[in-house]
Amino acid sequence: MIRTEPSAPVLRDRFANLEGSTYLISHSMGAAPLAAREALVSYWNDWSHDGPEAWDWWLPQIETIAAGIGSLLGAPSGTIALGPNVSAFQETIASALDFSGERCEVVYEALQFPTVTYVWDAWQRHGARIVCVPSDDGMTIPTERIAAAITERTALVILSHAYYVSGALVDVAAIVKRAREVGAMVMLDVYQTAGVIPIDLEKLDVDFAVGGSHKWLCGGPGCGFLYVRADRRMQFAPTATGWMAHAAPFAFEPAPMRYADSMMRYTNGTPAMLAYLVAAPGHALIAEVGLPAIRSHNIALTTLLLAEADARGIRTPTPRDPAKRSGWIALDVPDGARITQALIERRIFVDYRPGCGIRIGPHFYTTADEILVLFGALDELMR
């Protein structure tokens, strides 16, 4: 593990797109590791040279890559499955639950990323009853309001680790405690935090967790993951399934399904190996730097962001207490969409969300000078 002072960026030379740009968008798409290109070329070489025999090497990599993700999340060995995205894994878990009885409610926050709401809204056709917990300000939801929505009728609580609209962290422990009191399960979405905040899924005691690689984990799109608590792994048999979830996929047995006795039971068809292999170098870089050092550096730079914003009278909806925010800061400036596009044209990479503002997400490779470059450009564009 590399030890670094909070103000010292590291491993900038391991990335392809940091020179010639000011890369402040790791909350949306992490920078591209040079080793990811090597993995892509290696995949091509395996495919072009070995054809179908490449599967002999590719398939064991699924478990290796899953274990690497698990090590970044405090997840025990054998509790992570790989898949294309969070939407697919929401569907997988939904298909494993029974909504025919009194315990048929699915509780989620109104500030959930929309894909979650789309999947579960569709499951109302199959007996699920949705309980959506409202937000007063569109940025946060009181913990006690979420807890009050969880009852003996709740089958599953779907919880954001951090809200995508504001970066506010959620009190996971309090919600899990309430869910345990009434026998409900909890699924935690860590897409907004994995790779920038230390997470211990085993300690949090959630039943499921979902996320993906293309944000802070610097893994590019297409490598999502599902965590299932160790004592629940063999409890579920998803109907959203496929041949790779079978106990003996290469036996090509006809139905009925015989599920794998591993996390492969939560997968479906032929795995997208290219996405998994390309994601792994990013995961390795996160492990090399270490999440405590990453978080410390991120807090230092987001604190600098807040100070520069305050000096200019720029409002931010992001929590000011670092213990209550994820890895990015939002700046609520007039004509934010236009200014964001102008920044991108200067190769200062940020993004914009309506109702939130310009989002800036520094990572372990970000320098303090890059924060000042951003504000210098803002000073010009806001005149």
Model-predicted regions and their roles:
Residues M1-R383:
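Pyridoxal 5′-phosphate
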